[in-house]
């Protein structure tokens, strides 16, 4: 009796196109960071305008995160992810076609946020289910985090290099991302769908659990730490590099991309550490993350005061670690507090609080006329100490 032939492993793992979609979404979301240096120096745009354009991503991102999961349930994971990739490509093509128009850049940032929200929400579900179908459920979260982190860090670094060394610094990086998104769109065409969707069914956002969102641990532990997630990251790679741009003459876009890549790479590495630090009866991981963020803010204040490139890099490492720890610990807290039926909506509330940190560069740019940046960053550290005290005070007395 002849042995039955073994089935050959697929040349491309089924989860890889979904991971590539997450990376492409992250790339598009963060390519603006080094381009902001070009807008400030070559286009002579006011720092407040550049901060507004950076923040324009947020009003598109949050609805995308909220609706992406329900849309994927209704229409299918692959269809929603592919539509998001197409929108992401168009969102990059728009500012490339009208790079000197703030309105076009703003519209592109807004559309990029929508595309990223849908791609991240639906793409994470798709990747998890593809990994589960291959018997690798335990690897899903790690693969999703690495794919998204690689896109965020790689997009900033690549855009910085393209803007630094090649012509058309405000257009070429956007066109490269648009081409990448279309390539990933083609790759996802043959990836397996994990759910057929429920055509005709209304979008269901999931119920709110009052017991969860009103729980003292959510109110006094999770929420006070949440703005530090992206507040830390954006201070590191949006606020600090321009403050020392005169110390790297001619290399501002590249330096901005390097700092962004460093910050986000450290954040990806730090997220698993939150699992090790996490404790069922304390908020140890959250507290360590907040202390790290406060330290990063103080080092950033010193960097701004002394125009020190080296201290900006040190601050980026600390703020990146704080970003990763506070993000990871917040997700762990949400997973413990929320019942499965309310997990998506509770996670969205946490995400909304975390993404409020994206407003930090705009708030600092607006208030920079009233106080110098070293004082503003020190003030942020003081606010962080207050939040740290609140979180530490209520963490032991309010176990989940």
Residue ranges and their predicted role:
Residues 283-328:
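C-terminal transmembrane helical hairpin of 12-TM major facilitator-type secondary transporters
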